[in-house]
Amino acid sequence: MAFRKENKVKSFTRIFISLASSDNILAQSSGEVLKPETINYRTYRPERDGLFCERIFGPIKDYECHCGKYKRIRYKGVVCDRCGVEVTEKRVRRERMGHIQLVVPVVHIWYFRSLPNKIGYLLGLSSKKLDAIIYYERFVVIQPGITDKKVCDLLSEEEYLEVLDGLPVENQRLDDINPDKFIAKMGGEAIYDLLSRLELDSLSYELRHKIDNDTSQQRKIDALKRLQVIESFRSSKNKNRPEWMVIGVIPVIPPELRPLIPLDGGRFAASDVNDLYRRVIIRNNRLKRLIDIDAPDVILRNEKRMLQEAVDSLFDNSRKSSAVKTDANRPLKSLSDSLKGKQGRFRQNLLGKRVDYSARSVIVVGPELKMHECGLPKGIAAELYKPFIIRKLMDRGVVKTVKSAKKLVDGRDPIIWDILEYVMKGHPVLLNRAPTLHRLSIQAFQPKLIEGKAIQLHPLSCTAFNADFDGDQMAVHLPLGNEAILEAQMLMLASHNILNPANGTPITIPSQDMVLGLFYITKMRRGAKGEGLKFYGTEEAIIAYNEGKVDIHAFVKVYVDDIDENGTPINHIIETSVGRVIVNGFVPKAVGFVNEELSKKSLRSVISDVIKTCGVSRTAQFLDDIKDLGYMMAFKGCLSFNLDNVIVPKEKETFVQEGYKEIEEILANYNMGIITYNERYNQIIDTWTHVNSRLSDALMKQLREDDQGFNPVFMMLESGARGSKEQIRQLSGMRGLMAKPQKSVMGGGQIIENPILSNFKEGLSVLEYFISTHGARKGLADTALKTADAGYLTRRLVDVSHNVIINEEDCGTLRGLIATELRKNEDVVVSLYERILGRVSVCDVQHPESRKIIVYAGEEISEDKALAIQNSSIERVEIRSVLTCESKKGVCVKCYGRNLATGSIVQIGEAVGVIAAQSIGEPGTQLTLRTFHVGGIASNIATESSVVSKYDGILEIDELRTVEVVDEINNRHLIVVSRLAEMRIIDTRTKIVLATYNIPYASKLFFNDRDEIKKGDLLFEWDAFNASIVSEVAGRFHLENVIENITYKNEYDEQTGLKEKVIIESRDKTKIPVIHILDENGEIRRIYNLPLGAHITKEEKDVIRVGEVLVKIPRTVGKTGDITGGLPRVTELFEARNPSNPAVVSEIDGEISFGKVKRGSREVIVTSKNGDYRTYLVSLSKQILVQENDYIRAGMPLSDGIIAPSDILAVNGPTAVQEYIVNEIQDVYRLQGVKINDKHFEVIVRQMMRKVEIIEAGDTKFVARQLVDRDEVSEENDHIWDKKVVVNVGDSSNVKQGQIITMRKLREENSILKRRDLRLIEVRDSIPATVMQILQGITRASLQTSSFISAASFQETAKVLNEAAIKGKVDKLVGMKENVICGRLIPAGTGLKEYDKIMVETTME
């Protein structure tokens, strides 16, 4: 028998998966397993022909046969004549397969138990019928012959025998190929015969015809599903046959992959797979015996069924209802289970391997280390660098053999320390802290030998690792190869990773004590020693300080070197302090003199400036210097606080009293019936929120003034070293409102009306303490749940985007996104500068006044250019974006723009997909699970109810309809009755829009269109607690269909004794409650619909004036808007889920009218100006936001609720939905104060929009409703563009009907036919496929990726693999996961193919 001598790894470029035929399995097998025995329990040697047989799988000892006749390597390759074992090494037992020859074929469980049911669709049988055939309950007709049965009819045994009795005797003697013979079988054999008789091509043609012509939607859908399975087989181009889903031979995996492990006491722990194989072999052998002795059919059938079940369990035990269990009642792990899940083959062994040359230990702080260093304990270092030390020991001739060198190292002989120092030079180590949430969780450091057993970590790299020194552990890894060492030094060294890849701001930034020290010495105070002194230079100032002549905080004048706005060096006198002079001694000259208090915020901008002007290495040095200075000064300043530093504001008592006064008024109003229960609740919450924020402001003011701002508590807060405003407010203000415990998760977080008025300094009462414990505990529980959720989000994000790599310089697209600044009301949330910085412009950007070009098309927008654009009156810039990039693979440099981690334009090969996923996933743990923070304190924002102008200017109002109202004191104002009204404030001089507002329905408006306004004018106000319906006409009030206890109920308030009519959902769907406004003659002038939960404020026959409120609809109680907060919202958006109560959205512009009521829904009809109309059904339980005759725009909601992303895509197109998703997710992160650059979200959203759905397949290879890559469709459409489809073959024998042929072939064929005077071929033009863009959630997008290996390692492993096998998929190994799994270099960074081709040569002088 031949065997491989060299163990050379074959290089491969793609991996192909398909069904295995019996011949394939036999070709790979080394022999048949005949016995169920594993090993002999007396001799512990494998049994012959058993599951561990040495003859089949190879010897268990190197170069030794079973019987011992041949031993030693010299017999290598000899097959023993006594025991039949080949003499070779024992590792072949890891790769040699065996097989089991089954007596009857069985059906593979994957193909009839997983959905969609492949065999069922191919044969057109339901799962139930299929099970009846496979498990030997029914016969199935395979060939009807001369009977009246049809193919695939099921027969019970009686019916089968009846049919046989009715047939002439000779029928059964006919040959199977004879179409007259009646054949019916059951079990695997029947399925095998049926599948092998399928004609896929003609079946495909029939189904396509049926889809085109069938009238019933359901039949169409069924045919489509069948067609998809059939097309899968056809697309695998004869590599797959349907009958291979039935197996006659089962492969046996190598014994070392299912080992027997001896335990103490002579017992064995066997792998579960062995048990499953044993059951198959036992049943198979029993069946053989029964057939040999001609057992009756009933017994045979039962045994065959048991064999089918045994094979099912072997392949996939978890899919069966009656899984095979062990004695301990645990289901056995089958072959499928060993691939699935976190513990499966993919994720446990292929994507995450344990590696050699690694160590882990506790970390401690190393304040005297340099930025690029870490302290490595001697014990760890000696072990890690062992081979290098041994080599050096031998080179230097200290020892002769490896063994003795090993002894020296293990004995920690003093001689090895010098050698270790030498070996470690220029050989960095990698430090990693779990959880590795982003790429900065693994960084390279140059190790320094230290005593002790803990690793020392530089304090500035803690932020990146998210490490603290309360017992965290870190792992050390050693890069071995020269390339690896070089990459660690050039790319991963900690001093090179100063910027955060998520947003480009410095991440190695002093924190805690360092900040406190720097803040302390750059703070100035009046009246300090030496105030007003003048120094001619910085040295003199420092000498004076050292001599004790001047205080470090004193205001002094110093002559310093500085830099003006244009960056030219100047010298001038400035007022500063000695502390700031000392700090500036370390600041690079090119940055100028930093004359400000250094808090965490200002330090960040100083460090950014240093990086921009001086580069990374100088920044690293600067960071080290200010780290040392910060620690020194925190120590010198003795900054700790005592109880007296925690100041309780003087005004607290008065604020609280005022709060109580307001609440008395609210309760009085409530008791008089002026306001409803909900309004009372909302107003009370509002009052306390207001008191709390006033108290916070007073507290901050007082702390700031205390001891000239040198109050230690205030300094810790102000510098950003420790604590937050919220925490200080609780220490010395009041704890404020608390959240109610939720009975269920959906219970909604209500707020307890009575706030905790005490603070921690005064101490809480027992009741207050009890209320606050709830919040504290909930916080801990939430954190634990949140971590898992955030980790799973990151995993899905990486999976969807791991193959987005920068692959080319420029894709040449002409498209881009319009970037504008983002505003909420009039506050700028994100400036235009931030949005365009580091992007590439699509077209030339001209300055509007000077007409000078600021940025050319295709040029990166740098800081100064972005600033120039921001300062000009340009409002929008078209920038290149990943979303519009047209690269076939990955994205291009120009569309991505700047790499935030380096601050320069991105390089080809950068793995931007993974970086995006990490940047979004890493802050995930900081997002809230719900809407409350700080020990359960309710952060309910005081509700706004009016808009005051912040600018002078002119008003522009669009889409406005108003009615004029005169109130009791004869003041006139306008009430807005349109839903689309938008107000803009325009600068009178430059005509720039300063602010934009949407005016809510039913607002009071105080100005008209084109009015001039001044800063501080009240523009409009509205009722924040109620939505209302306003009458647009005067007349009499009349209620229609408002019937007690059917469409409304009286809500009786015990405290006030007042009744209110509240609309409820009626059982009788024909009765729709409406308000009619009647004129004098009783004619209806207007109709208003009443939504659920509406409170009717008027009585029957009341006289109604224009602009009066008819109905109030209370907004939900005390919830901060109707928002899903934090992580769940992010997940909802990334998964592109439709919200639970989606709004109904209009697809066209038009006027509203109402139709009939159908099945609990109201018809809303939108009619456009050209007469085109759409009808929408809005459920009666929803509030309809529009009234009769309103004019609305496409994309506007007709009912309340959140607009679903799929609607935005359908109505406003892909760009709108992309922007919507990016902005919505950004909102969640911004709320938590997390800054992430837009381009990361764009990368993910691009991956969500990769696929299109085929609407009409035309003449392409696709099937309707199939999801296909956009590029694939355009390729296929281009391919059939100028081809023809044969309609009539004429007299030609070379073409078939429906075949696609080229014009050339058509001309050739027809000219031949013409010469012979035969009928010509008739053709029509080919029809390309039409598609619709779809939006996929990240999970679906990951599973739909073109690489089946990547999809299988993500989720639903079995399903992904069995669909890939049927299609005969090829994995071209383009993404990262596939390459990691195959053990190759990833195709990104330095592993990119382009970099392999680089030749290095020396230039001759």
Curated annotation (Swiss-Prot):
A family per Pfam: RNA_pol_Rpb1_3
Binding site for Mg(2+): 468, 470, 472
Residues annotated for Zn(2+) 1 binding in this entry: 65, 67, 80, 83
Coiled-coil stretches noted in the UniProt entry, renumbered to this chain: none
Organism: Azobacteroides pseudotrichonymphae genomovar. CFP2
Subunit structure: The RNAP catalytic core consists of 2 alpha, 1 beta, 1 beta' and 1 omega subunit. When a sigma factor is associated with the core the holoenzyme is formed, which can initiate transcription.
Cofactor(s) needed: Mg(2+); Zn(2+)
Cofactor note: Binds 1 Mg(2+) ion per subunit.
Domain of life: Bacteria
Name of the protein in its database record: DNA-directed RNA polymerase subunit beta'
Record-stated family: Belongs to the RNA polymerase beta' chain family.
GO molecular function: DNA binding; DNA-directed RNA polymerase activity; magnesium ion binding; zinc ion binding
Keywords from the named record: DNA-directed RNA polymerase, Magnesium, Metal-binding, Nucleotidyltransferase, Transcription, Transferase, Zinc
A biological process from GO: DNA-templated transcription
InterPro entries in the cross-refs: DNA-dir_RpoC_beta_prime, DNA-dir_RpoC_beta_prime_bact, RNA_pol_asu, RNA_pol_N, RNA_pol_Rpb1_1, RNA_pol_Rpb1_3, RNA_pol_Rpb1_3_sf, RNA_pol_Rpb1_4
Assigned EC number: 2.7.7.6
Sequence positions that bind Zn(2+) 2: 811, 885, 892, 895
Job description of the protein: DNA-dependent RNA polymerase catalyzes the transcription of DNA into RNA using the four ribonucleoside triphosphates as substrates.
Catalytic activity annotation: RNA(n) + a ribonucleoside 5'-triphosphate = RNA(n+1) + diphosphate
NCBIfam families referenced in this protein's UniProt entry, alphabetically: rpoC_TIGR
GO CC list: DNA-directed RNA polymerase complex
